[in-house]
Amino acid sequence: MKVIIAEKPSVAQGIASVVGARQRKDGYLTGNGYAVTWAFGHLVGLAMPESYGFSGFRREHLPILPQEFRLVPRQVREGKVYKDDPGVVRQLEVLRELFDRCESIIVATDAGREGELIFRYVYNYLGCTKPFVRLWISSLTDKAIREGLRNLREGSLYDNLYLSAKARSEADWLVGINSSQALSLAAGQGVFSLGRVQTPTLAMICSRYRENKQFVPRKYFQIKVSAAKDGIAFSALSRNRFDDLETATAGLREVEDGGMLAVSSVERREAVQEPPLLYDLTALQKEANGKLDFSADKTLTLAQSLYEKKVLSYPRTGSRYISEDVFEEIPSRITLLQQYPRFAAIASALRDTPLNRRPVDDAKVTDHHALLVTENLPEGLSQDEQAIYEMVAARLLEAFSPHCVKEMTEVALSAGGEIFTIKGAVVKSAGWRAVRGEPEEEVEEATLPELQTDETLPLLASETVEKQTKPKPLHTESSLLSAMEHCGREIGDGQLRTAIREAGIGTPATRAAVIETLFARNYIRRDKKNLVPTEKGLAVYDTVKDKKIADVEMTAAWEETLAKIETGEADASSFRRDIEVYTAQIVAELLSATLDVAPSGEQCTCPKCKKSRILFFDKVAKCADVDCGFTLFRNKGGKVLTDKLIVGLVTTGRTPLVKGFRNREGRSFDAALVLNPDFTVGYSFPDRKPQGEKSGRKR
């Protein structure tokens, strides 16, 4: 028997139908000599610090550097502790039993870094030694599965891919766990999350926000003139920018005194616009955010759904090109789109046209080619799924269409010693722009009459126009994805920039999750389409902006090294040692940092140790030093103590009279709270001596 393991049940069902495994069992399908089973995402992951004997947040534990990482089943939180997910444990037992019985394994998890890691972690956790081969396909159509099964690849070919994925996973653990604990300890106020990619991304958002808000606009003035010829009116702006209205007005008077505009020059040229490349995941996410207002995470989810519905190729691709053999399939995909009403006419016209070969380059195809529609027409898509499908289909038609040809005209006019310019454009051949029929964005090109050098035109109107300089815009998800993708190009150090010029931070598959993490941590929020930091996010940024943890250059360099591990050009063990040194450095930096975040607005020193701060939480207030152990429960006698009451209690030893406590019988009473010598909390009744009572008891 051969076992095929897919990444999720829906994919396993599609593979099972192709190989004839139709008998359903608990956790797998069987038949025709196959057992087709599945994971559901990461069944196995890296153990948390508690597994290595490091409980709580303690300075003396840091940095936590396990000699060997332990693998554990995926865990769920129950109360204050994490336990193995029962469903995951059951499926792992199914996999153990199947692996024990089988002759060999066919790995059919997603053909990428994370898919490889999902299988290898399970394989290693179960201690399996059975031989395995790889099903490496770029779509889930029956045709692709059959072809992939005929061309199974040796599992060892993907050892470097696994080592890269493993190195990334361990680096994220080392940096994330240690930096988060270090900053939380330094803050003495709650728990703060940092990460290898998360924190530089937050820094990008915050630095742009600060730059935008601190920008001081500068006013300037231009002169606008209007003229007409052959019934076509047009306007032009002065090339000169005036710093003040008085000077601009003086220039305007000189222009008006002449009453005529002279055509100084007319330059005409033919402009050829190549079609855009096919989408990779990041390009799709950027355009879907700009045109549909979809988040990066939503776009990935929709693309994954279309992939599993067999109408889209593998979505987590970082390539915008296809290979020669895939190019041979493009005519049939174009023919298929003739059956799709929106694209029928364009597809029919393109079928009889030589296809543009710009997206065809074997050398630029990574693990997977660019996003394409498959040979299956979609049915029953949701409105959002249809929108993403149509974007990919339209881009396929655009990418293989002829280029767009325009005649560009630039005219210079003169009057009163000032030069005025205007640009015009006439489309001679729409080419790829005919697919969606959309005009160019952010391009102002007027329709101009036929103008000749040295001719003069009457000045019809003139005025001064007030303008002002503009800051860089706040980041949107689209612009942030671009910044994450191309940050290596922005590096100031020339030698370093050359070394990592194409490096970004994160990968196409992980960038959406990084952005969502920043939302989940309450570090950023949406303001319409813009991403803006919260007070908490800015406080974290101000603390780490000059630290290694926020260094975009360093993070981009790590990404470059991880890519080299995948190709065998770098050593995973050396990378691990470098990350451990880096982790120790950021821990030292963060432990000495000061983070000014006090969500409750109240701060006070612990009355017991008299050194650390009191942390305020929903149900308790406690000392930041876990060794001190001072804890005060907010619920006392049926009342929830406010931050102000707690501060008064721990700083003066008692509160004012509080009304409305209730005893065990439900009767109401009034009392002040007092802090006893053993640091428990008791009641002090009016005109009576204090009565000690443990803070967990009610009276």
Predicted regions and their residues:
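Metal- or metallocofactor-binding catalytic centers and their adjacent structured scaffolds
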Residues: 243-279, 285
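Basic, low-complexity terminal or inter-domain segments flanking catalytic cores
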Residues: 2-3, 81, 88, 125, ...
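Amphipathic alpha-helical transducer elements in NTP-driven molecular machines
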Residues: 9-16, 33-36, 40, 59-62, ...
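Intrinsically disordered, low-complexity regulatory segments
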Residues: 1-169, 173, 471
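Conserved short loop/turn motifs at secondary-structure junctions
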Residues: 1, 109-111, 188-191, 268-277, ...
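Short strand-coil-strand connectors
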Residues: 30-32, 226-230, 414-418, 665
